């Protein structure tokens, strides 16, 4: 009797555990993919000009370390303001603090001027932002994914 109970309990626990491994349904979710980079935008033209100045071939990529939080914020703010076609923004931690709300305002302004905005956030860093993110996701030019 005890063995039968333990077997049934193990099977039930296994079924529950395996059920938790299933992915959510993609039904109703819109398909989305990145827009290919183009040199026709103001940022693309600037990048092409800088590449020519550096005499760097097209296959070379680079990064520019931003040493201070102020520099990093200013760079993000500037790039969002200059966007004309699309923005793909990915963050591990996004807080509803002053800088986070200012950047969300910049993203909303970009969407209002016709820029497609895709925001990918780690859900662990968005505590208390569900309502705000849901509202942003209702904008026709904004996709929020957690």
Predicted features along the sequence, with ranges:
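N-terminal localization/anchoring segments of enzymes in phospholipid and broader phosphate metabolism
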Residues: 1-146
């Amino acid at each position: 009797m005890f063995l039968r109970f333990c077997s049934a309990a193990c099977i039930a626990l296994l079924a529950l555990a395996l059920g938790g491994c299933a992915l959510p349904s993609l039904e109703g979710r819109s398909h989305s993919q990145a827009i290919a980079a183009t040199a026709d935008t103001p940022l693309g033209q600037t990048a092409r000009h800088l590449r020519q100045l550096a005499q760097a071939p097209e296959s070379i990529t680079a990064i520019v370390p931003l040493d201070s939080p102020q520099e990093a914020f200013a760079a993000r703010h500037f790039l969002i303001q200059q966007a004309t076609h699309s923005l793909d923004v990915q963050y591990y931690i996004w807080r509803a603090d002053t800088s986070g709300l200012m950047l969300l305002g910049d993203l909303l302004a970009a969407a209002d001027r016709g820029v497609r905005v895709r925001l990918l956030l780690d859900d662990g860093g968005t505590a208390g932002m569900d309502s705000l993110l849901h509202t942003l996701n209702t904008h026709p030019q904004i996709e929020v994914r957690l």
